[in-house]
Amino acid sequence: MASNNYIQIMEKAPKYQTAYACEGKKLTIECEQGELINLIRANYGRFSITICNDHGNVEWSVNCMFPKSLTVLNSRCAHKNSCSVLAATSMFGDPCPGTHKYLEAHYQCVSAAQTSTTTNRPSPPPWVLNNGPPIFGNGSGLIHPTNIGGGSGGASAPPRLPTLPGVVGINGNGGMFNIPPPATHATPPGSTATLPGGRLKGVATSTTTTKHPAGRRDGLPPPPQLHHHHNHHTDETTPTKPSGKVPAASNATAPSNTRILTGVGGGGTDDGTLLTTKSSPNRTPGTAASGPSVSSNGSAVRTINNINLNAAGMAGADDETKLFCGPTHARNLFWNMTRVGDVNVQPCPGGAAGIAKWRCVLMKRMPDSSFDEDDEEMAGTSTTTPMSTSSDCLYNSSSCEPPVTMAHKVNQRLRNFEPTWHPLTPDLTQCRSLWLNNLEMRVNQRDSSLISIANDMSEVTSSKTLYGGDMLVTTKIIQTVSEKMLHDKETFPDQRQREAMIMELLHCVVKTGSNLLDESQLSSWLDLNPEDQMRVATSLLTGLEYNAFLLADTIIRERSVVQKVKNILLSVRVLETKTIQSSVVFPDSDQWPISSDRIELPRAALIENSEGGLVRIVFAAFDRLESILKPSYDHFDLKSSRSYVRNTAILTNDSDASAGDLQQRLRILNSKVISASLGKGRHIQLSQPITLTLKHLKTENVTNPTCVFWNYIDHAWSANGCSLESTNRTHSVCSCNHLTNFAILMDVVDEHQHSLFTMFDGNMRIFIYISIAICVVFIVIALLTLKLFNGVFVKSARTSIYINIYICLLAIELLFLLGIEQTETSIFCGFITVFLHCAILSGTSWFCYEAFHSYSTLTSDELLLEVDQTPKVNCYYLLSYGLSLSVVAISLVINPSTYTQNDYCVLMEANAVFYATFVAPVLIFFMAAIGYTFLSWIIMCRKSRTGLKTKEHTRLATVRFDIRCSFVFFLLLSAVWCSAYFYLRGAKMDEDVTGIYGYNFICFNTLLGLYIFVFHCIQNEKIRREYRKYVRQHAWLPKCLRCSKTSISSGIVAGGGTGLGGTNAGTLCSVSTAKKSKLPLGTNDDAHDEQQQQQHMSATEDAIMGASSDCELNEAQQRRTLKSGLITGTLQPSQSLGGHVVLERGNTLRSTGHASPTSSAGSTHLIFAHKPQQQQPPLGEAYYHQPDYYSWKQTAGGMKAQREYYNNAGAATSSPQQAHEVFYWTQKPNSQHGKKKRGGVGAIPASPSGSLHSRATAASQVLFYPSYKKTKPGQQAHPHYAEALDPPQPPNTAAYYQQQQQLRQQRQQQQQQLSSDEEQAEQHAHLLHLQHQQQQQQQRRAGGQQQLPAPPPHMAQYQQEFMQRQYRNKHSNCDLGDAYYNQGSVGGADGGPVYEEILSNRNSDAQHYEVGDFDVDEVYNNSVGTGVFNNMRAAVAAGGSRYGGSLSGGSVSSRNQQQQQHSLAQPISARRCTADEDDDEDEDDEETTAAEQLHDGVCDEEEEDEESDMEDDSHGLPPQSAERMRRLMALQDEDFKRRFQRQQRKHGAPVDYGTLPPGSAQAVIGGAHPEHNGAVFGVSGGVGEGSMRGALRQQHAKSPSARLAVNELFGHGNTGPPLPPANQTPAQKRQQLQKLSPQSTTSSSSHTSHSNPHSHPPHHQQRHLSAMLDENNTVRCYLEPLAK
């Protein structure tokens, strides 16, 4: 079976012969007996200058061809044993007149037996390789469909020659080469060809029977495998003897598998030996998979150019010999297609003797992302395809697959390789011109004239085209001339003649060297291989140096000779040592305008190398030599070499060395070459180094300059002895300790790599985009969170630091994303690098400051309260951005090219400036951050072991958590930046670990964004709460998101009775887009039903709404951040503390009376007072129509009159009770009384609750007025106060509804009259008077007292005028919309009213007056003002002593209650109008007479005029200051008391000047039954230095220890109605009045509650009230629902 595997046919190859005949002579062709002439090609003309040119004429054309030469010659010689043809124009014509022509014929002598069965078309010569038609003649490769299918393993090689010889015709194709016909017969015998060099090439063929497997018809070779070792088995090439017999088993159509190798440069031989390669035929599919011989016989490894192509076990695989380089033209020669691994050899172009060769190699194609699928298919089709051995597939396209279809089946790995001509130009090293050969012969003659030879050489090199061999000959002649002149100069006795002869010789030599360096001769240099180029360049430099020193040695006195030609400036200087005063500089500025290069030799170095008192120096400057003396791996032209080295892998016999070289950077010679010598051919070491200034030829896309010199021994550039002193974008300064030829080498940034992203693969690029996008999104969310939810945070230094860190990180991410897309030539590249440098320095500095801030917090009083430290933050800003900008500016001044000469637009160039201005500052900041973090951790450990207060422990835990998060943040950011840096550096050096760094950067950068969002946003409880509030308040969000049941984590007080909310309290959902102050109320009844009791917990949760009241202060008052806790309590004096529970943050419960362990400076603190709940009405059923609205349903027994609810008439079990709530903000007490604190001016008095900050120096207060919404089931919102004026009526009579209709009309008229807020405010005071009057009547009835007479009627006029002036400029920025007041009810007709109480800090409620910043002494420097203000101070002082500690520490102790009872018994000082009246005058008087009332009215009138004048002068003054607001609030409090007293006098009630109105601090103690009055609740907050509002540095000089006045609310009293909203416009009021339903129930203005048969003593309901002030000056109030 072995004989069936392959059949080898061996026969003698026909000889290939060439015959020539000069013009005018006969061409005779003869063959041996039995052989006939078989012409291959012929031409009458001239292709070579050496043939038939005895006189060396070089003017003849070498591209002379007669197209019909072969036809004419065939007519005379074809199929003849011999013939003779005259080479004359009469026979062939004259294709090129004036040129001496010759006739050239290529033929074979074949046997007569073969000619009877074959055609007359012969095969082309070996170097023509025209085996098939060029399908894609693109010059780089082509498909040659010669063989489809092949043996497994080695595969059958295509025949070098066609199987049948034929006549090559030139008709119609314009050339000498035709396509051979289909091969249908056996291969021809061997033939020999006579090459120009006289060598013969043996050609032989053999055929092999092949079978095509059914499963594969493409016959493509297997993918090649690159190996760097050669221990694989290769098929042997064995010589065989020619034989004319063809075995019977052979197939006539089977192709030959013998590979014919040419002798030059390939793997063949030159001795005519037949080389054959054995291979196995393909097996059938059945045997290919199962035969045991597949692994042995069917395995072969081919080695081409040291590339091992392993095709073991792959059926139907051919080897790489089916790949060909396409035909092309180069150096006036046509290079036909050549098989990979072969060398195409042909004679040199006309006018030159020798041979030219060019090799076809297989190169690896670098992946190009710009190729799409179609381009790759076409590229694969046009470059790599196997030869077909099937005659049917060769010329019958119907039986073969199309080429594109075959390309689809090409293995992907093989498609990465393509056949390429190597090197880029043909090798013409052996081509020499005839005239230079003549000069070489002349210079070697003994009596030749050296001057004449030098002149001829300069003329020839300037006018003639040279080839690679000519360069070698020319430089050799230059050296020979100098050597001969050295001996011949002695024959000239005259010194002047000697110098003249040598100078003329030097001029010719310099001119010749300039001609060789000229641009027109660049192709001649490229004809040489790299080694020969370097050798020729070295020979040229040494030849010039030898000739120059020949002249220098001849000169015996001081002289300077300059030889200047186009490309060379040569200066020979002979200097006397005594005349050398300074350094010698070359060249002069006017001598060499081509370049600004400069070389400076120090004087000491010259004197050391003097001889005989003379110093001989040779300077030379070259132009265009830099394009010749290129560094290794860059011996081609610059533009081509970039693409060549980057995009191909040269697979040659020295591929091992080349593989390592390709990993190196591409370097160019980036300066002109300049030379200085002190001795001929010697590298003289100098005691002092020379200085060179070299100008950069290329300033863009170059980096890393290196000073080098040309080493004559190694023929290469070397940096030994030279160093770079300084460099910039255009010049470099070098220092060398020896002399020779110098230049600058620089790295080239590949222009084909347009940006950094071109270095990424597809996945890497996508992942980087995603990672940066994620990080940017989360950073933006963090910044928006800090800005939108600004009030959640204390305006602290830490918050400012993190905002700046986020801004820097955002800038870094965006600049990096923009920079990796930019090219190095982009104008934005330098700017991006500069700003990125600044952003990184700023970011690292902020990290350092964050660590330092944590350290300073732990080592100072800031541990207790984190506040905004503006001076410190300003220092951080200055150090961070100022220092970063300064460093970048210094870097730009020192070396601007640092930002533009790097490979990528996101890195600086790695030089000294980079390490000094980037690496060093970043390391310093990072080390400082680590150091401060370590110190902070030590301090925390020490503090945790010491005894601290609860608040300090809380704050310490917060700081500990911040430091941990910051340290993790620091580590993560360091990992991101380090990964990015190493990835960029690795990508530049093409390291294998680059991908690891890239994916590390992607992962760490994504984690950085997630970490910012989670640990800096989500983990913050306050931000989570703000997120929920933000979702609920925006109507554009889905309702399912806005109306979700929510329980906040703020502090809530659960009373001792039932839950906070009633049953079925429901959920809360905001219906207004603006921030509103509202509190939905539920019910709070005693539950006897077990099911209702189980619902209390859920109702309580629903009643606690985190965003129920979030109105903000006006802009003028927005900076009043009060570090306050939340004080809650009942409306009764505290008597018991049992059963009270506080709902802490995090939904944890604890007992009251203790500080919250998790509270901090910005959290809530709960302090409350409590009285056991008295008799409660039965629990009723609660309904709600809208999410933020609670209605209720009356229990069985029918609807009661509304008058009962207003006046507390009827049974106490069914009447909801309301008391007066007074909210005041004041300072925290100082724990160390009498001790002066930092930031204060003196001792700080006590205040209601403990201080949160030891540096609180002054008080601040904000007045809160409650607004009420009264609704009734089944109707729209009612007016807010008119019902209190109506008498009670039976609810079941018809007259009741008639009276309601009349009252509705009265209300409309009354409401129209209230056209301004001034009238409305007056009505507030009027209603307050009714409540107080009713209380006094009840008290006096119980005590048997009589009513006092009413004041005169004229007092009302004064009151009305003053009130209108006082409230003229009141404004509001937090109006409640109509939708809030006009909500209906679903309670039905049997329901009762529901009061929803909303506590707000609306500016309209706070009554801000726009008056000037006046002095208190100036304002009250009269009898009226002084008395009022002094009386106010007395009231404040009394209030301060009364409340100073009553609600401290979160509980009310028995000691505080005793102090409070003691303060209740103190007399109240009365008001007087005189200026010199003391504050404590008449303190024993408890009532006033009518005369005193009248006198007080006159005082009020005068005071009104005084304040009116102040108001008129207030406009145009600066904004309100803290001191101004304090005075205004004091005036406001006094004004309200005066207004209340006017209402008393207007209605004839006795005026008690020492009694405050209901709702004020002193009104609580003024009644006869103080236990029935509501307890006073104070929401107190300490103001630290640096808070948002800012602490008052000092109190007023007149009252340094007096507490600020208590600002009363418009109290509704135990029997009063709800008050109208103070910020509603008249238009809104009218709209509400039009929507009134006829079911409203009111009563007359006369108070008749004492006559009601169902009236009961006033019942005081226990209602828990909690208010929380966050950092945004937003008060969140939670009021226990009213009882039903």
UniProtKB/Swiss-Prot annotation:
<feature type="transmembrane region" description="Helical; Name=2">
    <location>
        <begin position="800"/>
        <end position="820"/>
    </location>
</feature>
<feature type="transmembrane region" description="Helical; Name=3">
    <location>
        <begin position="827"/>
        <end position="847"/>
    </location>
</feature>
<feature type="domain" description="SUEL-type lectin">
    <location>
        <begin position="21"/>
        <end position="110"/>
    </location>
</feature>
<keyword id="KW-0675">Receptor</keyword>
<feature type="transmembrane region" description="Helical; Name=1">
    <location>
        <begin position="766"/>
        <end position="786"/>
    </location>
</feature>
<dbReference type="Pfam" id="PF00002">
    <property type="entry name" value="7tm_2"/>
</dbReference>
<feature type="glycosylation site" description="N-linked (GlcNAc...) asparagine">
    <location>
        <position position="653"/>
    </location>
</feature>
<dbReference type="InterPro" id="IPR046338">
    <property type="entry name" value="GAIN_dom_sf"/>
</dbReference>
<dbReference type="GO" id="GO:0005886">
    <property type="term" value="C:plasma membrane"/>
</dbReference>
<feature type="topological domain" description="Cytoplasmic">
    <location>
        <begin position="848"/>
        <end position="873"/>
    </location>
</feature>
<feature type="compositionally biased region" description="Polar residues">
    <location>
        <begin position="250"/>
        <end position="260"/>
    </location>
</feature>
<feature type="compositionally biased region" description="Low complexity">
    <location>
        <begin position="1328"/>
        <end position="1348"/>
    </location>
</feature>
<feature type="region of interest" description="Disordered">
    <location>
        <begin position="1080"/>
        <end position="1100"/>
    </location>
</feature>
<feature type="compositionally biased region" description="Polar residues">
    <location>
        <begin position="1455"/>
        <end position="1466"/>
    </location>
</feature>
<feature type="transmembrane region" description="Helical; Name=4">
    <location>
        <begin position="874"/>
        <end position="894"/>
    </location>
</feature>
<feature type="glycosylation site" description="N-linked (GlcNAc...) asparagine">
    <location>
        <position position="701"/>
    </location>
</feature>
<feature type="glycosylation site" description="N-linked (GlcNAc...) asparagine">
    <location>
        <position position="396"/>
    </location>
</feature>
<comment type="subunit">
    <text>Forms a heterodimer, consisting of a large extracellular region non-covalently linked to a seven-transmembrane moiety.</text>
</comment>
<feature type="glycosylation site" description="N-linked (GlcNAc...) asparagine">
    <location>
        <position position="728"/>
    </location>
</feature>
<feature type="glycosylation site" description="N-linked (GlcNAc...) asparagine">
    <location>
        <position position="297"/>
    </location>
</feature>
<keyword id="KW-0472">Membrane</keyword>
<keyword id="KW-1133">Transmembrane helix</keyword>
<feature type="disulfide bond">
    <location>
        <begin position="722"/>
        <end position="736"/>
    </location>
</feature>
<dbReference type="GO" id="GO:0030246">
    <property type="term" value="F:carbohydrate binding"/>
</dbReference>
<keyword id="KW-0325">Glycoprotein</keyword>
<keyword id="KW-0297">G-protein coupled receptor</keyword>
<feature type="region of interest" description="Disordered">
    <location>
        <begin position="1270"/>
        <end position="1353"/>
    </location>
</feature>
<feature type="compositionally biased region" description="Acidic residues">
    <location>
        <begin position="1476"/>
        <end position="1489"/>
    </location>
</feature>
<feature type="disulfide bond">
    <location>
        <begin position="707"/>
        <end position="734"/>
    </location>
</feature>
<dbReference type="InterPro" id="IPR032471">
    <property type="entry name" value="GAIN_dom_N"/>
</dbReference>
<dbReference type="InterPro" id="IPR043159">
    <property type="entry name" value="Lectin_gal-bd_sf"/>
</dbReference>
<keyword id="KW-0812">Transmembrane</keyword>
<protein>
    <recommendedName>
        <fullName>Latrophilin Cirl</fullName>
    </recommendedName>
</protein>
<keyword id="KW-1015">Disulfide bond</keyword>
<keyword id="KW-0807">Transducer</keyword>
<dbReference type="GO" id="GO:0004930">
    <property type="term" value="F:G protein-coupled receptor activity"/>
</dbReference>
<dbReference type="InterPro" id="IPR000203">
    <property type="entry name" value="GPS"/>
</dbReference>
<dbReference type="InterPro" id="IPR000922">
    <property type="entry name" value="Lectin_gal-bd_dom"/>
</dbReference>
<feature type="modified residue" description="Phosphoserine">
    <location>
        <position position="1315"/>
    </location>
</feature>
<feature type="region of interest" description="Disordered">
    <location>
        <begin position="370"/>
        <end position="391"/>
    </location>
</feature>
<keyword id="KW-0430">Lectin</keyword>
<feature type="compositionally biased region" description="Low complexity">
    <location>
        <begin position="1631"/>
        <end position="1654"/>
    </location>
</feature>
